[in-house]
Amino acid sequence: MFARGLKRKCVGHEEDVEGALAGLKTVSSYSLQRQSLLDMSLVKLQLCHMLVEPNLCRSVLIANTVRQIQEEMTQDGTWRTVAPQAAERAPLDRLVSTEILCRAAWGQEGAHPAPGLGDGHTQGPVSDLCPVTSAQAPRHLQSSAWEMDGPRENRGSFHKSLDQIFETLETKNPSCMEELFSDVDSPYYDLDTVLTGMMGGARPGPCEGLEGLAPATPGPSSSCKSDLGELDHVVEILVET
């Protein structure tokens, strides 16, 4: 049976080993969590900058988070080893400085930068980012302008076709128009003369009225049908022109 003191030493040694292993695990897990948080913060910062109207409070909070992680990694000495890997993962034009991202918003709102943002943070190339945003904006404006001009062009073509139709109607000689509609007006005049003759004459009997109307009705009805057919034909010609 082991002595009491020796047993305690063995247990203490095992506990120290387990504690060291647990500490290494916690340190490695914390470094992984910190690296993942840094990556997510950089992505969110980029997305905030790409918005048309970025949220100032959100961008400042994300920038402060990136700044704190950078300070911790510089103190641990892991910033120099991780920075090239991050540069290989994402292009340089996406890792833009937090001060550059928030400078325009600070100038518009008249606010001062957060105390967590200093002058010693990393700076990304601004010249690489500006052409991208300036190239995206005109494309969006051109697409919206083309979408708005589409119905206007259709309206313009419709108005032009109407103007051409009215011009063709105005340029024609009025005598030609009278000749076209002369045949249409003739049966109405015949019907008027028949009605005026019936009203102006003596009041006939019932049999005489029927005899007088019987031979007169077939002629105007047939002529009206033919004239209406001609009128439809003329209207079709005018619509086609």
Swiss-Prot record:
Occurrences of domain SERTA (ranges): 30-77
The regions listed as transmembrane in this protein's record are: none
Q: What induces it?
A: By E2F1.
Subcellular location per UniProt equals: Nucleus
Instruction: Report, as the record phrases it, the tissue specificity of this protein.
Output: Highest levels of expression in the pancreas, thymus, testis, spleen, liver, placenta and leukocytes. Relatively low levels in the lung, kidney, prostate, ovary, small intestine and colon. Hardly detectable, if at all, in the brain, skeletal muscle and heart.
Q: Which domain of life is it from?
A: Eukaryota
Alphabetical GO CC annotations of the entry are: cytoplasm; cytosol; nucleoplasm; nucleus; plasma membrane
Which molecular function GO terms apply here?
transcription coactivator activity
| Entry keyword Nucleus | yes
Keywords for this protein = Nucleus
Q: What is its main location?
A: nucleus
The entry's function note states: May participate in the regulation of cell proliferation through the E2F/RB pathway. May be involved in molecular regulation of hematopoietic stem cells and progenitor cell lineage commitment and differentiation.
The protein in question is named Cell division cycle-associated protein 4
Q: Which organism is it from?
A: Homo sapiens (Human)
